[in-house]
Regions:
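Conserved HATPase_c
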Residues: 165-169, 201-212
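Hydrophobic alpha-helical transmembrane segments and their immediately adjacent juxtamembrane loops
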Residues: 216-308
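Peripheral, non-transmembrane regulatory/ligand-interaction domains of membrane transport proteins
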Residues: 1-195, 214-217, 307-308
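Non-transmembrane, extramembrane segments of multi-pass ion/lipid transporters
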Residues: 158, 199-202, 262
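Generic secondary-structure boundary/loop-capping signal
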Residues: 57, 152, 189, 197, ...
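Long amphipathic alpha-helical coiled-coil segments
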Residues: 190-205, 231-241
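Juxtamembrane/interface motifs at transmembrane-helix termini
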Residues: 183-191, 199, 227-229, 287-288
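Residues at secondary-structure transition points
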Residues: 120-124, 202, 242
Length: 308
C-alpha cells in the first residue's frame, strides 16, 4: 500500500504515484517485486528482501537516486522483526521482510500520522518511524538496570544461587543485541545525514540529527549497563573463588586436626612386641585419650588463631 501527502493522506496505487508529492509505502516481498522495475531498484536489493537477515550491521547501500538498507528490529517479547528501507527523493518505501505480529507495520502507520499532512516531509517521516521503533526502549533499559541492581544486592548478601551465572549471561546477550541494534540505526541515520546522493533538504536534516542523538543516548545507557554486567561477572567470579577458598580452608583445618591421630594410629599399628602399651591393660584407653587430647588441643588452638 502507498500513501501520498497532499494536504491530506491519500492511499493510492503504485501507478498513481506523483513524484512531486511525498509518497510513503509499506509492501511485502511480492509487491516489491512487481514495482521494483518502475522505481529502478537493483535486483540484488530486491533479492535481499526475500529473507530476513540475522545480522544487525548489514550496511547502507547508496545508489544515484536512492538509498537501500536492511533493518533488524528487536522485539523483547516476541521474535525480532526485519524490514528493508528504500529511500528515494520524496519517497520512503518500507518492505516487510519479517513482521509476523504486525508490530512494525503498526509503528509505521502511527509515524504517518505524527505530523499534519501539509507539514509532513520525507525527513519528518523517517524521524517519526525511527522514533516509534525506539519509543519504549528507555523503559526496557531501566528495567534491565533495576534487575542488575537486584542481582548486585543478592551477590553482596551472598544469597545467589546456581542460576545467577545464567541470568547474567542472558542480560549480557540482550545488552549486546541492543547495542548492535542502535549501532545499526546510527549507521543509517548518519548515512542519511551525509546526504551523498542529494535525496534530502539540508534545512530538514535536523530531524535526522535529533533521532541520531536520541539513539546515541540509548546506546550509551546500554554500554553503561554492559560495564555493570562485566563488573558483576568479575564480582561473581571472586565470590566463587572466596567460597572455594573457605571450603578448602575447612578441609585443611580438619586435616590438620586429625593428622596427628593418623600418626598415632600408624605408630601403634607397627605391632612391635617390645611396645609396652600392648601388654598394659589400660593401653587401649590410653590411645583413645591421647587422640582426643591431641585433637581437642589443636581445635582450641585453631579457634584462637581464627583458622575457622
Amino acid at each position: 500500500m502507498f500513501f501520498q501527502f497532499n494536504n491530506k493522506i491519500n492511499e493510492i496505487s503504485v501507478d498513481k504515484i506523483d513524484d512531486s508529492f511525498l509518497t510513503v509505502g509499506y509492501v511485502n516481498g511480492d509487491e516489491l517485486l512487481s514495482c521494483s522495475q518502475k522505481f529502478g531498484f537493483a535486483e540484488s536489493t530486491v533479492e535481499t528482501c526475500r529473507k530476513p537477515t540475522k545480522y544487525f550491521r548489514s550496511g547502507v547501500e547508496l545508489y544515484d537516486n536512492y538509498t537501500f538498507t536492511e533493518l533488524r528490529i528487536i522485539d523483547i517479547e516476541t521474535a525480532d522483526d526485519c524490514v528493508a528501507l528504500y529511500i528515494r527523493k520524496n519517497m520512503l518505501l518500507v518492505v516487510d521482510v519479517s513482521d509476523k505480529d504486525g508490530s512494525t507495520k503498526r509503528k509505521f502507520m502511527s509515524a504517518l500520522r505524527r505530523y499534519a499532512p501539509e507539514n509532513t516531509t520525507l525527513e519528518k517521516v523517517i524521524y517519526a518511524f525511527f522514533d516509534s521503533l525506539v519509543a519504549g526502549d528507555i523503559k526496557i533499559i531501566e528495567d534491565i538496570g533495576m534487575q542488575l541492581s537486584s542481582l548486585e544486592e543478592e551477590l553482596h548478601e551472598g544469597s545467589v544461587d546456581e542460576t545467577f551465572s545464567t541470568v547474567i549471561l542472558e542480560k549480557k546477550k540482550l545488552l549486546l543485541s541492543l547495542h548492535n541494534y542502535y549501532e545499526q540505526i546510527l549507521d543509517i541515520t548518519e548515512s542519511i545525514d551525509e546526504n551523498e546522493n542529494d535525496l534530502f533538504q539540508s534545512d530538514h536534516l535536523m530531524y535526522i540529527n535529533n533521532i541520531t542523538k536520541r539513539v546515541e543516548r540509548l546506546r550509551e545507557d546500554v554500554d553503561s549497563l554492559k560495564n555493570t554486567v562485566e563488573h558483576l561477572q568479575d564480582a561473581y567470579s571472586s565470590y566463587l573463588d572466596a567460597k572455594l577458598n573457605n571450603t578448602m580452608k575447612r578441609f585443611t583445618v580438619i586435616t590438620s586436626i586429625f593428622f596427628p591421630m593418623t600418626i598415632i594410629v600408624g605408630w601403634y599399628g607397627m605391632n612391635f612386641e617390645s611396645m609396652p602399651e600392648f601388654s598394659w591393660k589400660y593401653g587401649y584407653i590410653y590411645v583413645i585419650a591421647l587422640s582426643v587430647i591431641v585433637a581437642g588441643t589443636l581445635a582450641i588452638i585453631g579457634k584462637k588463631r581464627k583458622w575457622y
